[in-house]
Structures are given as C-alpha cells and as structure tokens.
Amino acid sequence: MKTLLLTLVVVTIVCLDLGYTLTCLNCPEMFCGKFQTCRDGEKICFKKLQQRRPFSLRYIRGCAATCPGTKPRDMVECCSTDRCNR
C-alpha cells in the first residue's frame, strides 16, 4: 500500500505542470536594471524605442502576450527568453 501511495505521489509530481514564468526588463531608461515577472499568458519580452521628435527617444520595456505594434519612426524588438529585452 505504501509503495502504491509513493508511486502515485511521484507520478503526480512528474506530471504536474509547475508553470514557467518569464522574467523581462521593465523600465523606461536606456540602461535598465529592473525586472518583472510576467503574468500568465505573457510569453513575450519586448523593447520599444519611440522617436518623439528629433533627438528625443523614449524606451519602453516589459512583458506582453504578443509583440506590440509600431507607429512610424518606432522600433520594436521581441524575444521569448528570460531578460532578453536588454
């Protein structure tokens, strides 16, 4: 009986989806050191560079469910591994 119980526990642990959470940089600066753990469904890290006016750039980094869209003069890079949006 103990063997059966132990076997069931081992099978449950092996089959259990422990859930992987992605970690992405999340800050508006060019050089960033703040990280966030992405929520369920967010499997993409992104880095967006917006050109507001000549010589004025804005950086946006974070997690997303899909790669964000762009406007003219924007640049977006998307990736799917931890801290890949440097």
Swiss-Prot record:
Keywords: Acetylcholine receptor inhibiting toxin, Disulfide bond, Ion channel impairing toxin, Neurotoxin, Postsynaptic neurotoxin, Secreted, Signal, Toxin. GO terms for cellular component: extracellular region. Residues 1-21 form the signal peptide. Expressed by the venom gland. Disulfide bonds join C24-C45, C27-C32, C38-C63, C67-C78, C79-C84. GO terms for molecular function: acetylcholine receptor inhibitor activity; ion channel regulator activity; toxin activity. Pfam families: Toxin_cobra-type. The keyword Signal applies. It is found in: Secreted. SUPFAM superfamilies: Snake toxin-like. The keyword Glycoprotein does not apply. InterPro entries: Snake_3FTx, Snake_toxin-like_sf, Snake_toxin_con_site, Toxin_cobra-type. Binds with low affinity to muscular (alpha-1-beta-1-delta-epsilon/CHRNA1-CHRNB1-CHRND-CHRNE) and very low affinity to neuronal (alpha-7/CHRNA7) nicotinic acetylcholine receptor (nAChR). Belongs to the three-finger toxin family. Ancestral subfamily. Orphan group II sub-subfamily. This is Weak neurotoxin 6. The lineage of its organism: Eukaryota, Metazoa, Chordata, Craniata, Vertebrata.
